């Protein structure tokens, strides 16, 4: 187990009241959180989203990506379901950090795609560690999930880490002229399942 559960509090949102649960990485002290809606106990698979931190999309309303749109849609789907979990995975910029993400954006402004920009900065296309998310699910006593994602790699890694992903639920929202190239690159180079028609 790479994490410990350290704090929780109620979080009222436009979609309803969630329980915010804070986790801390034992080795580094880095923090992550889960938003839990309703009663997630029992044997029925839980609707869930693993949402990686994106300050620009989630808080600054960037149109360069689909992250903020996905965050809002996921919270709405979970509330409609009546129960579910959103894991907020604090690995900004596919885990290259905010400042490197800004540098990657500058390279994209010069014509690189999102994968090429990461490579030019010396990073892999995706540096995230989703095994941390498997630990969060385990600490919430969730072992069967209907995962809101377009990323089959997330499904594979979570399954390998002991979380049974019984269904991949598509979450295709937020397409706009500013992020068409970004989404096309995620589909072509990172294997994301997106209807690009």
UniProtKB/Swiss-Prot annotation:
Family membership noted in the UniProt record: Belongs to the GTP cyclohydrolase II family.
Coiled-coil intervals: none
Residues at the active site: 126 (proton acceptor), 128 (nucleophile)
GO cellular component: cytosol
Gene name of the encoded protein: ribA
Species in which this protein is naturally found: Pectobacterium atrosepticum (strain SCRI 1043 / ATCC BAA-672) (Erwinia carotovora subsp. atroseptica)
Catalytic activity: GTP + 4 H2O = 2,5-diamino-6-hydroxy-4-(5-phosphoribosylamino)-pyrimidine + formate + 2 phosphate + 3 H(+)
Pathway assignment: Cofactor biosynthesis; riboflavin biosynthesis; 5-amino-6-(D-ribitylamino)uracil from GTP: step 1/4
Keywords: GTP-binding, Hydrolase, Metal-binding, Nucleotide-binding, Riboflavin biosynthesis, Zinc
Positions with a binding annotation for Zn(2+): 54, 65, 67
Cofactor: how and how many bound: Binds 1 zinc ion per subunit.
Cofactor requirement: Zn(2+)
Protein name according to UniProt: GTP cyclohydrolase-2
Record's keyword annotation contains Zinc: yes
SUPFAM superfamilies named among the record's database cross-references: RibA-like
Family annotation (InterPro entries): GTP_cyclohydro_II (IPR032677), RibA (IPR000926), RibA-like_sf (IPR036144)
